[in-house]
Regions:
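Acidic, contiguous internal or C-terminal segments within carbohydrate-active enzymes
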Residues: 4, 95-149
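Acidic/His-leaning functional-site neighborhoods
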Residues: 9, 71, 76-83, 187-269
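Extended, loop-rich substrate-binding clefts of extracytoplasmic carbohydrate-active enzymes
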Residues: 65-117
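A short, structured loop/turn motif at beta-sheet edges
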Residues: 82-89, 114-119, 148, 153, ...
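Generic short beta-strand segments
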Residues: 92-98, 252-254, 287
Length: 290
């Protein structure tokens, strides 16, 4: 386990999946879910080279079929620590024989965590080291504790969105998205009350860059933690029915397949492409408020 800290925050990150494990403020208050396997055994997994699911867990490159687990393999793969300073950690995953079995590309994936005051910058960097174009998706899945909620009790949370009436998608058809099912989420000037039933049909998904900022509010109605992101999609999730006291806010460069999708990997919705030698970099920001 690696650690970085400043006068406001302390982070712990595991080399397994380059996964953020803990966010504590100067008073020792924890903001990130503890990974209790009774509810959900992760904290903040990195999603790569796909986000969410494939139709029948299968995709095609030039007609050849491959399989990948939901959210890809990065979250369960050991990364190497390649950089450490007082305020920044960088982990890297380079393709190998094992990754190439189900993802036939050469790549270098780097995940960095940088502290800046009360902010955590989570930085994704993908480099194409192949001699051909590569395709990929990437995303985050951090789980934040909801103020006032406890394990074993029904989860209720108040969120603040920067869009008062975004349109949601439904990803509940074999783990993939029903292309026809859409619904406007009504809020009170961006204030959105959620509970476990909100996620009865899996994550609430907003695409087309409708939402760029989400806050979890505390019991006084003030921001507790805020995420800012530039991704075209974001998922909001809680494991409904488990009485788990957290909400995941998931910025995504990618989405599940459409239900019944049987096309080529390159034709997936929200697919990212890199030419040989090119690289992709983006970040999202976690702001610890109160």
């Amino acid at each position: 386990m690696e650690q970085i800290k400043n006068d406001q925050l302390t982070l712990e990150i595991s080399s397994l999946g380059a996964e953020l494990q803990s966010i504590k403020d100067a008073n020792g208050n924890e903001y990130l879910w503890d990974g209790d396997e009774k509810y959900w055994n992760r904290h903040s997994p990195i999603l790569f080279p796909i986000v969410c699911g494939l139709w029948k867990d299968t995709y095609r490159i030039d007609g050849k079929e491959y399989t990948l687990p939901r959210h890809g393999f990065a979250r369960d793969t050991e990364f190497k620590l390649v950089g450490k300073t007082a305020d920044r950690l960088t982990f890297a995953l380079i393709d190998n024989e094992e990754t190439q079995k189900n993802y036939p590309y050469h790549f270098n994936l780097a995940i960095s965590y940088r502290l800046e005051g009360n902010e955590i910058h989570v930085i994704w960097h993908v480099e194409n080291t192949d001699d051909k174009e590569i395709m990929f998706q990437i995303g985050g899945h951090p789980a934040f504790l909801v103020p006032g909620c406890k394990k074993g009790e029904e989860m209720k949370a108040t969120l603040k969105l920067d869009n008062e009436a975004p349109v949601r998608l439904y990803g509940n058809v074999g783990g993939c998205i029903d292309r026809q099912a859409k619904e406007t989420v009504e809020t009170e000037k961006g204030i959105w009350e959620v509970n476990e039933e909100t996620f009865a049909e899996d994550a609430v998904i907003f695409d087309k860059s409708q939402v760029k900022q989400v806050s979890i509010l505390n019991e006084q109605g003030e921001p507790h933690v805020t995420l800012e992101f530039k991704t075209p999609a974001v998922g909001i999730w809680n494991p409904t029915g488990k009485h788990a006291p957290f909400v995941c806010i998931e910025p995504w460069y990618g989405l599940s397949d459409w239900a019944e999708f049987d096309g080529e990997f390159k034709d997936k919705y929200l697919m990212n492409r890199l030419q040989p030698g090119a690289s992709f970099m983006s970040e999202y920001i976690i702001r610890i408020e109160k």
